[in-house]
Amino acid sequence: RTSKIIYKPLGTVGIIPAWNYSFSIPLGEVVMSLMAGNVVILKPSELTPFIGLKIGEIFERVNLPTDVLQVVTGDGRTGASLVDSGIEKIMFTGSVATGKRIAESAAKHLTSVVLELGGKDPMIVFADANLELAAQGAIWGAFCNSGQSCSSVERLNVEESIAEEFTKLIVEKTKRLNQDSGDKETTDVAAMSSERQIKIVEDHVESFRREGAKILTGGKRNENFKGAFYEPTVISNATNEMRGMREETFGPTLPIATFKTEDEAVRLANDSDFGLTASVWTRNLSKGKRVAEKILAGTVCVNEVLYTHGIGQTPWGGFKQSGYGRTHGKYGLLELVAPQHIHVNHFLLAPNAWWMPYSSNAVETFRGFAKHFASGSLRQTVKLMPQLLKRIKELRSK
């Protein structure tokens, strides 16, 4: 007898990406879905429809068969119709609230979903870290793409003994950042995506002020520019109880809290509804890996931050309210296929002993095998072979 597993395409995959990385995220998911043999419907964010259409144009140039990839534009109602259409898979990147609605709607059709719903990602800096390197990493992790990344550093937890020195270093480096138009190659921090998003940032920063945190730099719109330009903002005296440390901000803010022990650092990192990514900074790599394995997040870096979405071989996804399912690599491909087990009986000379009809000899044989085979007694099991052959002969005579 032999068994093998083959993988079949699911059928139609619906991809609903967010607006923040509106080219790279859906492009990768489209490629993986097509590689797995599926057809794809891409519904780009209503804020970035032309990028979705551009992805469709790219695949037209490679002579993809007609309608294997379709791009449909529209707002949330279009996305809701896609989810409710009964297709085989939905891959969604976006907010927790929308992700829950998608999961509820998809469940009516038993449509499986992959949900990547953002994070509140912690960065832990121990006293033995390379502080210069960690400071540069924190600034890039917090302010890249104006903080509009699901894996942005949104909570900076620093060991108490170095907190003052490290915070000073962060503030100095933040003040040197160049904020300007995004079409200039030397710009460090550009505008945010929308007025709606900058208002969320303003709301969170004001909540930090009300709850006793200190704004060390930034904390307001950049008045030198028109549009949604918010200054890179560093906040000290933050605690995990503050609203701005619990809700996803998705903007250029870097709130700093402190810890005293390794256990407290882990507890603070895990004290969140989210679990997408995290990072640990220390010269002691054994400690770094030990702490990383205790953190409840889909990806944990040691002395690195933010960029791992670009490692195509590794799974991407989160725990808790950050969603479920994975994209990228082996585990991402397995989300896009249905495993089928093929089993073949090559021995065609006799029936199976457990087939009907049953007899007293059959009952005695089954009890003997259950007792001796399951207990690991090979000698006693072998002694049952004559009885087993008798049972097979009994069936062949029926």
Question: In which residue ranges do the predicted regions lie?
Answer:
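Rossmann-like NAD(P) dinucleotide-binding subdomain of oxidoreductase/dehydrogenase enzymes
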Residues: 1-133, 385
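Residue-level signal for inorganic ion chemistry
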Residues: 37, 69, 90, 119, ...
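Short helix-capping segments at alpha-helix termini
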Residues: 61-65, 177, 181, 242
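Short glycine-enriched loop/turn motifs at secondary-structure junctions
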Residues: 83-84, 117-118, 150-151, 185-186, ...
